[in-house]
Amino acid sequence: TTAVKDGDGWVLNGSKMFITHGTSAHTLVVMAVTDKSKGPKGISAFILERGMPGLLAGKKENKLGMRASETAEVIFQNCRVPASHLIGEEGQGFLQTLQVLDAGRIGIAAIGVGLAQGAYEAAERYTAERHQFGRAIGSLPAIRERLNQHASAVEACRLLTYRAAWLKDQGR
């Protein structure tokens, strides 16, 4: 996606794929190349609002899971954006993206910890209910060892996630 200065604003052209809430979001933050010669320092961030001329919703993806939010293509066809919708200064978009990703990765880690905790709890229930050789398989040393390793790994991941969040809060 490119953004070209035009009078008192910008004109965006291009498209973005796999955008969460691409067909329903009222406000979008869009990264666009404003100066190709500067590489990553030539990317800028813009705020776009649904209904702006030239801002179009493209194909909605038929996803296997995570259907609570739609994922779709967003298309920009000579989409005029006021200069006041530039976030920060021209060329800061790549750095802004990295800062957002840093925080987002902590959230993704937390989701992973929750999923791992749920899997561990399901395994605990199953090994308590499933009987073999006249007793619950959860009482067998080999099964107990694997469950203990899983519990330790989940707790290690939880603590690493907490530490990452704490470091982010400390500005590190």
Language model features with spans:
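A structural signal for short hydrophobic beta-strand segments in well-ordered beta-sheet cores
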Residues: A3-V4
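A generic structural signal for beta-strand entry/edge sites
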Residues: G7-V11, T27, T71
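A short core secondary-structure module
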Residues: N13-A57
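Glycine-rich beta->alpha junctions and the first turn(s) of the following alpha-helix
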Residues: M52-A156
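Short, intrinsically disordered, charge-balanced linker/junction segments flanking boundaries
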Residues: K168-R172
